[in-house]
């Protein structure tokens, strides 16, 4: 059913104001709003441990070039800068699409070229997309960058990819220093690391690539739809679209799902890390610089098919594969 059939406030202006025109548009077909926005997760982040950086004099990178310089320094110091694993059974490859998407938002024309890429107006063969793949390949294929190399990239389960960050070698060095992954990954952390989010382990924003482009945030999230207009359905719809809905979850210590409601009380999050993530999503939605995961928006045979497969092929075959 259209949202107007079940939302007690028949005027949907309030809903559209609270959840941004971008998210509202994702749930709209032929002018009718069917999907109601709900929770969101933040993907434009890189996990790291401040104490490990500080002990070695490393600085948090704000730009791609700074991140590459840091990676080179870590390799020169005899360690691996990145954890990276994208095995996910039949969905293997999706993690690399997230890297591509973050790079796409920060190159070319930013959100404009990103949106055209999603709708196939901008082809995968376009130089903007090839450039994003080239930058991703730099992370994948530079010797020493990824713990375990490309073999580990294609064979390590994504939920275990960050584990080396939480282990130490005989010299007291972690297996890696940076792990680019969404806010939800904390639920996959090893038991010994549970409770570290926002304490021993935190995040920095995915670095800018083209400094002339405004900041953007990549994310995923949940949407819901109603299949009848019963009174009980209307009551649930009212609650789901309220700023109160996410409050109980936000106060859970390991909650990694943020409210997509721009009026949500950010002070309710369980710690400063999640609060900053929530504020980042809210600010990006208000500035129209939040974008949903591109592969999830593309037709399934592309976003959940050939795109995933080609990311695996890129990892295996190296940068020369980009022009094949």
Indicate residue ranges for each PLM-predicted region:
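Short, small-residue-biased leader/transition segments that mark boundaries at the very start
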Residues: 2-7
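Extracytoplasmic/periplasmic substrate-recognition and gating elements
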Residues: 55-56, 191-260
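Short helices/loops that flank or line small-molecule/ion binding pockets
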Residues: 1, 52-53, 69-77, 157-179, ...
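Bilobed periplasmic-binding protein-like "clamshell/Venus-flytrap" ligand-binding domains
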Residues: 34-35, 76-89, 242, 246-253
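Periplasmic solute-binding protein
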Residues: 23-60, 68, 85-117, 218-225, ...
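Short, solvent-exposed loop/beta-turn-alpha elements that line the ligand-binding surface or hinge
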Residues: 8-21, 86, 105-131, 191-196, ...
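Long, aromatic- and glycine/proline-rich binding clefts that accommodate carbohydrate-like moieties
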Residues: 201, 250-315
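Extracytoplasmic ligand-binding clamshell segments of periplasmic binding protein
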Residues: 86-88, 109-192
């Amino acid at each position: 059913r259209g949202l107007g059939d079940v939302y007690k406030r028949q005027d949907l202006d309030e809903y559209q104001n609270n959840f941004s025109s971008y998210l509202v548009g994702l749930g709209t077909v032929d002018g009718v709003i069917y999907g109601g926005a709900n929770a969101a997760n933040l993907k434009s982040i890189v996990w790291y441990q401040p104490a490990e950086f500080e002990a070695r004099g490393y600085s948090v990178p704000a730009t791609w070039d700074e991140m590459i310089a840091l990676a080179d320094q870590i390799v020169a110091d005899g360690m691996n800068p990145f954890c990276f694993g994208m095995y996910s059974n039949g969905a293997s490859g999706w993690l690399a699409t997230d890297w591509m998407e973050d790079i796409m938002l920060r190159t070319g024309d930013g959100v404009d070229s990103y949106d055209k890429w999603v709708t196939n107006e901008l082809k995968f063969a376009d130089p903007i997309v090839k450039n994003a793949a080239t930058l991703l390949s730099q992370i994948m294929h530079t010797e020493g960058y990824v713990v375990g190399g490309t073999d580990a990239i294609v064979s390590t389960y994504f939920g275990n990819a960050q584990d080396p960050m939480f282990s130490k070698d005989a010299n007291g060095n972690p297996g890696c220093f940076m792990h680019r992954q969404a806010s939800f990954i904390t639920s996959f952390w090893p038991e010994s690391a549970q409770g570290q989010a926002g304490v021993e382990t935190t995040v920095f924003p995915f670095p800018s690539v083209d400094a002339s482009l405004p900041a953007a945030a990549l994310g995923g999230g949940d949407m819901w739809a109603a299949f009848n207009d019963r009174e009980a359905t209307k009551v649930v719809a009212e609650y789901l679209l309220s700023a109160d809905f996410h409050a109980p979850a936000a106060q859970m210590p390991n909650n990694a799902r943020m409210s997509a409601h721009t009026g949500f009380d950010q002070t309710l999050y369980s710690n400063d890390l999640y609060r900053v993530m929530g504020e980042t999503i809210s600010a990006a939605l208000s500035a129209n610089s939040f974008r949903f995961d591109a592969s999830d928006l593309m037709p399934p045979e592309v976003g959940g098919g050939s795109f995933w497969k080609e990311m695996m092929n890129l990892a295996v075959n190296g940068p020369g594969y980009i022009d094949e």
